[in-house]
Amino acid sequence: MHLTQNYIEILNIFVIKTSRHTACHLITDVTELFMPLALFALTISAFAIGTTEFVIVGLVPTIAQQLAISLPSAGMLVSIYALGVAIGAPVLTALTGRLPRKQLLVALMVLFTAGNLLAWQAPGYMTLIVARLLTGLAHGVFFSIGSTIATSLVPKEKAASAIAIMFGGLTVALVTGVPLGTFIGQHFGWRETFLAVSMLGVIALISSQLLIPANIPGRAAASIRDQVKVLTHPRLLLIYAVTALGYGGVFTAFTFLAPMMQDLAGFSPAAVSWILLGYGVSVAIGNIWGGKLADKHGAVPALKFIFAALFVLLMVFQLTASTQYAALATILVMGIFAFGNVPGLQVYVVQKAEQFTPNAVDVASGLNIAAF
């Protein structure tokens, strides 16, 4: 009888422990499922924001014609957006530091959507300027806090990959969103492009509301001393400089990629469009690969390798630019490395800010975004 009772007690203990073990695994599985969904919400938002950032380039001639303004004036819409990013990234990020991250993220997507709706209904040039400034402000703060939100959703060893997933929305916008938006603008009018982007903003808003965890707290407001330290700490200044020079060099090459492939390599304008699409696909692949590389080997070793490869590829392109197939191969390989540095740069500045200025991490992230 006692033996049977002992067996029953042992069985009960086994069942309880097994149940706890199973429950732990179940919670882990649910968490692992939830995190990618939350990152997916950030990616959708990044895609919407990336589309409105880049699509204006293809709409400048149409806007200039319909609003009866000069091409340089229409081109100012690009500069005004960049000004909004530069202001929004460090300044508004610092001012909104105490707000819960989800609440701030949803508010940003409301501002972004409202800005694009204003652009859709803009009666004139000045209203369009205001609309672009508002969306630029939302852009700056989003990518500042988006990086820290993304890293908070995953273990530290996957931080760079999480940032890469978020920035993947930006690269996909470059590949698909911009050509699609330009197509809409050319066939239905530039206003309808902003309406379409507004719809993306609504989708991003709903996704953020449903999928982003509500328990991500805001940070303590950065004091003046903390903000000054973010602007003066040698290691952080070095990271900002690396971001500005390294990414700036790549983006300069991208800016003149189309004329170089057309005038030097001899490709037709139609072929150049396909080449840019292929370059965008390479960029999207390289972004994810760069995040995994930084997670596996560390941000600094990954960045050293990527920047060294970009240096070699840019030098090689001087030799291959006048030969079609060699130029094409160089460009496609360059695309893999072109955005591969972004996850490493962003996760590195977050890591160093947590070490040197723990009360101003989002501000440091914002300054690094502004350096892009």
At which residue positions do the language-model features occur?
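Extracytoplasmic
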Residues: 41-71, 253-258
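Paired small-residue
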Residues: 126-134, 325-333
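Cytoplasmic helix-loop-helix junction between adjacent transmembrane helices
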Residues: 133-168
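Conserved MFS/SLC helix-loop-helix module at the cytosolic interface between two early adjacent transmembrane helices
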Residues: 89-123
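Helix-loop-helix hairpin linking two adjacent transmembrane segments in secondary transporters
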Residues: 125-127, 156-157, 164-210, 256, ...
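Intracellular juxtamembrane helix-capping segments at the cytosolic ends
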Residues: 142-154, 340-355
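A late C-terminal transmembrane helix in Major Facilitator Superfamily
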Residues: 358-372
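Helix-breaking motifs and short loop linkers at transmembrane-helix boundaries and internal kinks
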Residues: 68, 100, 121-126, 266, ...
